[in-house]
Structure formats: C-alpha cells, structure tokens
C-alpha cells in the first residue's frame, strides 16, 4: 500500500516511479478493471506515479529556470562556473546534444524492436508497446530535436560557407 502514497514513491525502485510503470498500470495485464471499485490499489498507485512524474518535471523546470540554475550556467560560462569554464565548452555541449540524442533514439528506442539475426522482431521490447504509443513517442523525440535545432540557432555559429548544413538538417527532419 505504500506505493499509493505519492510521498513514499521516490523511496521505491525507479522501476515503480516513471512512465513505464504508469503505462503498465494503465494498459498492462489487469488494466481492464482499473475503473472498477475493487481496483482502488491500482488506481491509487497510478495516481502516485503520475504525481511523482509531475514532481520530477517541476523540479527539472525549476533547476533550469532559477537564477542560478542550469540555463544560467549555460549562458554564463566562466572560471567560477561549475559546468562551463568558457564559451567553447558551452558551445561544444550545445552541438553535442543532437548527435547524442540520435544515438539514444537508435540504441534505446529502435534497436530493441529491430529483428534479431533470426529475423524475428521484438515488439514487446518497445517502449510504450502496451499503449501503442511507441511510434508517437519516437516521433515526439524527433520533433523535440527539430525544435531544439531551430531554437538554438546553432547553424549561426558555423562559418558562412558551411551554413548550408542547416537546410540539409532541416530536410532530414
């Protein structure tokens, strides 16, 4: 019963706290009885997971936006900055995010479901397979990367003769 209390959930296994747990509770085995009066435990557990996800999102947002948060650190590199000692470090990190994100999408989202050597696919290895949200989630990952690419204006730091890369990258999205 302790997992139904949002205050206790952060002390539990990570496997019980996030989107995968919530998806299982809402779409996994036994979810067809979720709205029935006898399934208060599952409903309470799902509520606790959703509350925990909300709390984590709020904490991340606060860390990014507070006066001494990560956004401020990123835009104010210098000797006293724990993250970025100079502009080059900040720009290097900015530029590395898309390639690292593409690797994560490939390694953690796509490869688990790609057919093995025997030719058999592994659809139940896909994130959010129970809810049929695998592909919308992957699409959202790419949409977020496209937005990041556009908003960061990273192409503007390239020499003029290399800025054509921006159009090429936009086309790929």
What are these regions (language model features)?
Residues 1-173:
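Mature extracytoplasmic or organellar-lumen-exposed domains after removal of signal/transit peptides
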């Amino acid at each position: 019963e302790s997992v139904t209390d949002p205050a206790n959930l952060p002390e539990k296994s990570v496997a019980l706290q996030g989107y995968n747990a919530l998806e299982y509770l809402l779409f996994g085995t036994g979810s067809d009885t979720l709205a029935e009066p006898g399934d208060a435990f599952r409903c309470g557990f799902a509520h606790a997971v959703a509350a925990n996800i909300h709390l984590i999102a709020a904490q991340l947002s606060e860390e990014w936006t507070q006066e001494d948060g990560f956004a401020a650190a990123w835009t104010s590199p210098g000797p006293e900055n724990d993250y970025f000692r100079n502009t080059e470090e900040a720009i290097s990190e900015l530029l590395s995010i898309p390639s690292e994100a593409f690797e994560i999408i490939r390694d953690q989202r796509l490869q688990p479901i790609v057919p093995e050597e025997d030719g058999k696919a592994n659809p139940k290895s896909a994130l959010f397979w129970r809810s049929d949200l695998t592909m919308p989630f992957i699409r959202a990952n790419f949409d977020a990367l496209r937005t990041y690419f556009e908003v960061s204006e990273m192409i503007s730091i390239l020499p003029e003769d290399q800025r054509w890369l921006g159009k090429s990258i936009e086309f790929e999205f």
